[in-house]
Every structure is written in structure tokens, then in C-alpha cells.
């Protein structure tokens, strides 16, 4: 039956607020876990590893030298056992902070003192904002709340987030955790979020606020699809795709974000488990990229490469292979159980173990774990009062608003006018959703505001479920009756974790069960505007709704976090002008019917009827394209500055001086001697808001290169989000590096500068640029 709902908060919200108030009045706080408590044990003051005035290297060397082999092995696992004789407590490495402090992993938990933490939108929606400042701001709040929880013994300091895998296939259950399908967006998200988590207020590179971890390295984007399982999947990836699609976010994490950790994945890449591949770990992460931190396995990965993948004949051999490849920390206990046996069998020596635990200890020292009482350190004043603050919760609301994508708006049907809507029908399986809004890898939110509650704060709203998300059985008749009696309808449908999640990929792109029938029949009966809200991580084939004239507006809201209902209402009623853009392609169902999820190739193969993947390589039909979006205003672009010609100066003996070349290596003296002070040039654009209301707008700079080396159809060079008032204009500047930004990856995985005609794209503008020698 339909029911009136003007609830401002749920009962659980009121209870949570009550608990917070009580806990603030309590002086019985738990203590954080830390080493070198010289106040409690003055004898520790003479230990060099407890001397914060020494270099981290000197302290680590001293500590490792004091440990027995058995004690060393205890620090190879995520539940480090500690050494009481040296004043080192046990420590749980595994905490998560994908979009807020989580209680997944055991390293962090919620208690009476801190019963919840701010739950921001799931990453895919935050990425849709294309706002680098927002990415970093969220990371900073999450790390502040984490430190506050650590100070009362409720959290660790090492967080295995973010997930920067490429959202390669629309069926992937974990696509919701990622920044989307584009390497440039994913890289910028990775760097900004990592900096938000890690950077200290003092800016000391040898100190960490918390330690972030970029995962899952590498080419991991399938969980469980038609009996293809991540634990046994061998990702066959050519060097070209590895270099220009799968690796860039991880490289950016390490090189530009200075992340403290990288997690290797379950899958194999070209026949080798990533956690036992010395080329990927020691060669690339620590060698080429110079990781300052530790490499951790996904949980049980070393056990998996032995028991599931049969890459090692014995557990001891599996441990040895992982340590010798460059793995420092094993999530779970496998390496702790079998490392001693590996040493005794001569498969690995103690030096390899010393190297691994040294990286782990160095990270903890940068966090201040070995500096004594954290309450006397930089963030020692943080506590429960700094978690779930009004500002933090407002940022969660604003983050959701900035990410929401308006996909259809017939005849300007949105925003709705509150004064014109006397009765609003709110219908659908996600219309009164709570936990669904916060996706996965979440904690306990400060509070929930459901879509129904958010809308009901503005206009009189009547609710009808229609069906649950699976929508096997539906009460469509009651929903139709309600729609027919209301001035406007908001339908909130889509997915939840039963449809898409870790360990569960989708098999099709249809709305679940009878949801399409529910939407179509409700829209047919409605006598006013019909707003379709899709709550999901991945895209759906909603061609039926796109073409249905009775459905006047469509919005995608991802999983919008604890304040999702408020953000949705802000957009629907015009308090916020939508400015999000899709971070991934929405494909038709026909696409997944002919493309196996297990095919890792990004580029099309016409001879096999393979269409390729992502906007960079796929030219077929889409439901909605990457970066698609509408807004309540209009923005015009005018190109002010960009070169027509870039000349590269080659050495006298360079072979391309005497013969015609299609491309050059993207390294060498010619990369320093191009026009405009090196290999850089600037693109300036004037952007004007020509509409009748203020709004934010993302300016995208794309490029199309000459078709050599299977180069992308187009690729994103950069983006900038700006806010303009009515009739306001501003200049947006992009700095373009020829060798970095205009290069493509060849078939061997090397970067090349394509010579000849390039196109720069901004909106409908196209600018020709020629690169010559």
C-alpha cells in the first residue's frame, strides 16, 4: 500500500545521534596501538629504532638486526604478531577506505565512541564529477576521520584503497569501485585521492597521514562471469594494451601520487600470477617506478597461486616465489605459516625476508607508529568530535551532487518547481534505499537520507515500492494507480549488491527482473513529468526509456552515499545544476551478447568481428557515450590559443632525417627541443555560460592522432572543471607535452610520437595540429 512519508531521519539515525552524544560525554576512551612507548617503558628509549631523530633507514636497519628469524616471519603477514620484548605490539594491516573509513578487514571498527564515519559516494559517481579538487578533498576528510579513530583505538593506519583498475567491461561487478574506463581520468583520480589520504599538513614527504594502497595490480577486471573466476583467470594481455590502458593508473599512483603501497591481484597475467611475477613487482613497481613503500598481496593470493593455479609445487615454493618476486606483505597467514619451511628448504634466504619486512617497517615509521604516543604527535588532538562533522557530511552531499549525471531532459522538464508540485509519486525498488546507496566496502554511515526522504523534505511525497531490486514479483498495479494521481513521478530503479558486487559479475545489461515493465507502465499512466533515476555502478541498456516520450528525464546517480537522497532532491528541484559526466560507456545489450568478458583486447579486430572496448577504440552503437551529460544551462567554447605546427628537432644522425617515418620514440633530445620552450605548448579556451542560471562545467580536451600503431580513435588529454555564473566567462588553459600527451603506444609497448596530422577536440570544436621533423 502507498504511504505518506515526510521522515527527516530514520530511527537508526536518531539512535546513532544518541550514541554519539553519549560517547562524547564519556572519558573512557580506548588507546591507540603504537610501538616505542618510552613513557610506559623507559628502557625502550635507548633503542635506536625508537629514536625519531634518526633516518628511517637507520632505524629500520637497527630494528631488523634485533629480530630473530621467527620474529621476522611474523611481520610478513597482515596480522603482524608483534615483539613484546622490544615494545612492539601486534598490528592489523588490513583496513579499507574506498569512499570512507570501512570496517572491512578487521583493522578498523566502529564502537560506542565512534559509531559511524562519513560515507561518501561510491567511487564511480565521485569520478563522474571530473573534479580533481573534490577527489583530494574527500581523501583528506577520510584520512582525518581515520586518524581520529586511530587515536581512540578504533582504526589502523594502513588503508588498502583506492581501486584504480580500468572499468573495461560493463558487466564487471566491481566497476562501481573504480574511476571508470579512461586511463587519464583513472590516473588523475588515483593521484588526487592518494594525496588526500597521505599528505600531512606539514608536507613532509617522509611522513604519512595514513598509508594508501593502489590495487589490484594488474589487468584485474573480472570476478566471476559464466564460470570464469578471478582466482584462476589468466588475463592474456598484449604489451600495447598493458602499457596504454591497464598500467597508467598504477604508474601515476606510484610516480605522481607517491603511494605507500601497491596490491598485486589474484589473476595471472600472460601465464604468471601477479604476486609471483618479478618483472611486474621488482622490475616495474620497485625498479622503474621506484615505489617508496611495500607491496601487499590480495588476500590469500599466495595460497591461491599454490592451491588454485598450481604455479608452485609446495606451499614453501609459493612463499619463496612471491618473496623473490618482490612481495613484502601477505594478506592473511599463508607466508607466516610456510616461510620458515621455505628457508630451511633453501628456497629463499633470510636476506629476502629482511628486505620485505624492511619495506613494511619503513612504512610504519613514516606513519609515526614507532614514535611513541600518537596523542603527542601531529594528529594527536583528533578524536570522535572530528568524525561525522557537519562539514564532512555536507561534503558527502556535495560530492554526490557533483557526480550526478543528467542524461535526458525533454523540453526542459527538469528542474521541477516545488510550488507547481502538490503531489509527488516516488516509486521503485531504490526509492527508499539506505544501504544500497553506499555501495560496497563501506562502513557505518553517520546517517542515511533516502531518495524518498530527500524529496519529501521539499514537496508532499507518496511512496510505492513497486518491487524489490530483483523484481521477480511486482505490484505494478498499485504503482500505476499512484502515478496516475500525482502531479509528477520520480522512479528510482537500478541495481544493488545482489546484482553487481565483488565475486559477482552481471551476465546482461537489462534492468533486473520486471523493472522495465514497472517503468514503462508507470510512465504510461503518469499525467505529469516522469523522472527516471538509475542507481547503479555499471550502465544499463535503457534504450526503451531513452526513446519513451512519456519519460521526460533520466538521471544516473551511481551509489550516491549517505546523503544521496538530499543530493538527488537538490538536482531534481534545481537547487543544484547537474554537472556530472559519464565516466564509462553505456553499451546496448547486443554488445555483451557478442563480446566475451574474458577477452582482454582493447582494440577491435574486424577479421573476427570483435568491436573493441571503451570510447577510445569502440565505434559501434551506444546507449550513452563516455562523458555524455546534460545541464540546466548552456556553455560555449571558443579557441583562443593553440599552435598549428610543432617541429621536432632531430640529431644529425637520426634516421628520420633522411627517410620518411610515421613515428618517433617519445624519449630523446627531440622531446626537449620542440616549440614554445621545450616539448610543451598551451591550449587556451574561452568558456562562456550562455544560459539563464549558474552552473559548473567540465571542459574536456581530447586528441585524435594519425592512425599508426593502432592508435585510439580519440583519447582524453585533460579536463578542467569550472563554475560560471549566468553570462559569466573564463579562460581555461591546458599545458600539452608533445612526448607525453600526444604520443601513442606501439605494438611492443613503447611510446611513440605519431608524425603528421593531429586533431584536438573540445566540445564541437576541432583544431588541426601538425607534428613534423
UniProtKB/Swiss-Prot annotation:
Protein name: Beta-D-xylosidase 3
EC number(s) recorded for this UniProt protein: 3.2.1.-, 3.2.1.55
Transmembrane regions listed in the UniProt entry: none
Described function: Involved in the hydrolysis of arabinan. Can hydrolyze (1,3)-alpha-, (1,2)-alpha-linked side group residues and non-reducing terminal L-arabinofuranose residues of debranched (1,5)-alpha-L-arabinan backbone. Also acts as a beta-D-xylosidase, releasing D-xylose from arabinoxylan and xylan.
Molecular function, one GO term: xylan 1,4-beta-xylosidase activity
GO CC field: extracellular region
Tissue: Expressed in flowers and siliques, in the early stage of seed formation and not at seed maturation. Detected exclusively in the endosperm of very young seeds when the embryo is at the globular stage.
Amino acid at each position: 500500500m502507498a504511504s505518506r512519508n515526510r521522515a527527516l531521519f530514520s530511527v537508526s539515525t536518531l539512535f546513532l545521534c544518541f550514541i554519539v552524544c553519549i560517547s562524547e560525554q564519556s572519558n573512557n576512551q580506548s588507546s591507540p596501538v603504537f610501538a616505542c612507548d618510552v613513557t610506559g617503558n623507559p628502557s625502550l628509549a635507548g633503542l635506536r629504532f625508537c629514536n625519531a631523530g634518526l633516518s628511517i633507514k637507520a632505524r629500520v636497519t637497527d630494528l631488523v638486526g634485533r629480530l630473530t628469524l621467527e620474529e621476522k616471519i611474523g611481520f610478513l603477514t597482515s596480522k603482524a604478531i608483534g615483539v613484546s620484548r622490544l615494545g612492539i605490539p601486534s598490528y592489523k594491516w588490513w583496513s579499507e577506505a574506498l569512499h570512507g573509513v570501512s570496517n572491512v578487514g578487521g583493522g578498523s571498527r566502529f564502537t560506542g565512541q565512534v559509531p559511524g564515519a562519513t560515507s561518501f559516494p561510491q567511487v564511480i559517481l565521485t569520478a563522474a564529477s571530473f573534479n580533481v579538487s573534490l577527489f583530494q578533498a574527500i581523501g583528506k576528510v577520510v584520512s582525518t576521520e581515520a586518524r581520529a579513530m586511530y587515536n581512540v583505538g578504533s582504526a589502523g593506519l594502513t588503508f588498502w584503497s583506492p581501486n584504480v583498475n580500468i572499468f573495461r567491461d560493463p558487466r564487471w561487478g566491481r566497476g562501481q569501485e573504480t574511476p571508470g574506463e579512461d586511463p587519464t581520468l583513472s590516473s588523475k583520480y588515483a593521484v588526487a585521492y592518494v594525496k588526500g589520504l597521505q599528505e600531512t599538513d606539514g608536507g613532509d614527504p617522509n611522513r604519512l597521514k595514513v598509508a594508501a594502497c593502489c590495487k589490484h595490480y594488474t589487468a584485474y577486471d573480472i570476478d566471476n562471469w559464466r564460470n570464469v573466476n578471478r582466482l584462476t583467470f589468466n588475463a592474456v594481455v598484449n604489451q600495447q594494451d598493458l602499457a596504454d590502458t591497464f598500467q597508467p593508473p598504477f604508474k601515476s599512483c606510484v610516480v605522481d601520487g607517491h603511494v605507500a603501497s601497491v596490491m598485486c591481484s589474484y589473476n595471472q597475467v600472460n601465464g604468471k600470477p601477479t604476486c609471483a611475477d618479478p618483472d611486474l613487482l621488482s622490475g616495474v613497481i620497485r625498479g622503474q617506478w621506484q615505489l617508496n613503500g611495500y607491496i601487499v598481496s590480495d588476500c590469500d593470493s599466495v595460497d591461491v597461486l599454490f592451491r588454485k593455479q598450481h604455479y608452485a609445487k609446495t606451499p614453501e615454493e609459493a612463499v619463496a616465489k612471491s618473496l623473490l618476486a618482490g612481495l613484502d606483505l601477505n594478506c592473511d597467514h599463508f607466508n607466516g605459516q610456510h616461510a620458515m619451511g621455505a628457508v630451511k628448504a633453501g628456497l629463499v634466504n633470510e636476506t629476502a625476508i629482511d628486505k620485505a619486512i624492511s619495506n613494511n617497517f619503513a612504512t610504519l615509521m613514516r606513519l609515526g607508529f614507532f614514535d611513541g604516543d600518537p596523542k603527542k604527535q601531529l594528529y594527536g588532538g583528533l578524536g570522535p568530535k572530528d568524525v561525522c562533522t557537519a562539514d564532512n557530511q555536507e561534503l558527502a552531499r556535495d560530492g554526490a551532487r557533483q557526480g550526478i549525471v543528467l542524461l535526458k531532459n525533454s523540453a526542459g522538464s527538469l528542474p521541477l518547481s516545488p510550488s507547481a508540485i502538490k503531489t509527488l509519486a516516488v516509486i521503485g525498488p531504490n526509492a527508499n534505499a539506505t544501504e544500497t546507496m553506499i555501495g560496497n566496502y563501506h562502513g557505518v554511515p553517520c546517517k542515511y537520507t533516502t531518495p524518498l526522504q530527500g524529496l519529501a523534505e521539499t514537496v508532499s511525497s507518496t511512496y510505492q515500492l513497486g518491487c524489490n531490486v530483483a523484481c521477480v514479483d511486482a505490484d505494478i498495479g498499485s504503482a500505476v494507480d499512484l502515478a496516475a494521481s500525482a502531479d509528477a513521478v520520480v522512479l528510482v530503479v537500478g541495481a544493488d549488491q545482489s546484482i553487481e558486487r565483488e565475486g559477482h559479475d552481471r551476465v546482461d545489461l537489462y534492468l533486473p527482473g520486471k523493472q522495465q515493465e514497472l517503468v514503462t507502465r508507470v510512465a504510461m499512466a503518469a499525467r505529469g513529468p516522469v523522472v527516471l533515476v538509475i542507481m547503479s555502478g555499471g550502465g544499463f541498456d535503457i534504450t526503451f526509456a531513452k526513446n519513451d516520450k512519456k519519460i521526460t528525464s533520466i538521471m544516473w546517480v551511481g551509489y550516491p552515499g549517505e546523503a544521496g537522497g538530499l543530493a538527488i532532491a537538490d538536482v531534481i528541484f534545481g537547487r543544484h545544476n547537474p554537472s556530472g559526466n559519464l565516466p564509462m560507456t553505456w553499451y546496448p545489450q547486443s554488445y555483451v551478447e557478442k563480446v566475451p568478458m574474458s577477452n582482454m583486447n582493447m582494440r577491435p579486430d574486424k577479421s573476427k568481428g570483435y568491436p573493441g572496448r571503451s570510447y577510445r577504440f569502440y565505434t559501434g552503437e551506444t546507449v550513452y557515450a563516455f562523458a555524455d551529460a546534460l545541464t540546466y544551462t548552456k556553455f560555449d567554447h571558443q579557441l583562443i590559443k593553440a599552435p598549428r605546427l610543432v617541429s621536432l628537432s632531430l640529431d644529425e644522425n637520426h634516421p628520420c632525417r633522411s627517410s620518411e617515418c610515421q613515428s618517433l620514440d617519445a624519449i630523446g633530445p627531440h622531446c626537449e627541443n620542440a616549440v614554445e620552450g621545450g616539448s610543451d605548448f598551451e591550449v587556451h579556451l574561452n568558456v562562456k555560460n550562455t544560459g539563464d542560471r549558474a552552473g559548473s562545467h567540465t571542459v574536456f580536451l581530447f586528441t585524435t592522432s594519425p592512425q599508426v600503431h593502432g592508435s585510439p580513435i580519440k583519447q582524453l588529454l585533460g579536463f578542467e572543471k569550472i563554475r560560471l555564473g549566468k553570462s559569466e566567462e573564463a579562460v581555461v588553459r591546458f599545458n600539452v607535452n608533445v612526448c607525453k600527451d600526444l604520443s601513442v603506444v606501439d605494438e611492443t609497448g613503447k611510446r611513440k610520437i605519431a608524425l603528421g596530422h593531429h586533431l584536438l577536440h573540445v566540445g564541437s570544436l576541432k583544431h588541426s595540429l601538425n607534428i613534423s621533423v
